């Protein structure tokens, strides 16, 4: 079995070409649909089975981020049947997909996290993430960098928050 690194996609990876790509019988799809049903959201399968791609509908954060997560996890599960996955990574939304893929959180936990973040994104519109180093060139914790992060968070008046720690970086 060959070894593989899986890089998880971020926003922008669900496009018109993605329509019809979700298998309604796949466990991930069923879990996602249950979670969205609990929140009163349009089913992902309804979006994925649409006759045409409508950017205003499909690219809403509350729809597109969960679609990307589910599709990426299905693809990664298929890849892991053919390859030994030795590392995972991603950017932006891909960080959260990588957490699921690596087993740091369950699929359901990761899905709920991504769904909640996408709803917050719609509710608050503005925002973003900053990746800030916490380690030195030898990948050892750097107290000065950590102090700078804390000082920045404290001076933000509650506008900036720590999201996750990812490797040697803080995601703010």
Language-model regions, residue ranges each:
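Helix-rich "cap/lid" substructures immediately adjacent to catalytic or cofactor-binding pockets
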Residues: 2-89
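Short, well-ordered loop/turn elements at secondary-structure boundaries
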Residues: 1-2, 166
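Short, flexible micro-motifs
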Residues: 12-15, 97, 106, 171
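Glycine-rich nucleophile elbow surrounding the catalytic serine of serine-hydrolase chemistry
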Residues: 90-100, 104-105
């Amino acid at each position: 079995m060959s070894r593989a690194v899986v890089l998880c996609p971020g926003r922008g990876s669900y496009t018109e070409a993605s329509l019809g790509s979700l298998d309604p019988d796949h466990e991930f799809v069923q879990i996602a649909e249950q979670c969205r049903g609990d929140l009163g959201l349009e089913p992902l399968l309804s979006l994925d089975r649409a006759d045409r791609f409508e950017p205003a509908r499909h690219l809403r954060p509350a729809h597109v981020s969960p679609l990307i997560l589910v599709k990426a996890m299905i693809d990664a599960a298929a890849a892991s049947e053919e390859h030994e996955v030795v590392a995972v990574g991603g950017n932006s939304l891909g960080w959260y997909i990588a957490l699921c893929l690596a087993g740091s959180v369950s699929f359901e936990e990761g899905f709920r996290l991504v769904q909640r973040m996408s709803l917050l994104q719609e509710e608050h519109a503005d925002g973003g993430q900053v990746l800030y180093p916490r380690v030195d060139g030898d990948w050892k914790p750097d107290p000065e960098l950590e102090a700078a992060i804390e000082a920045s968070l404290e001076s933000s008046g509650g506008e900036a928050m720590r999201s996750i720690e990812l490797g040697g970086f803080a995601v703010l």
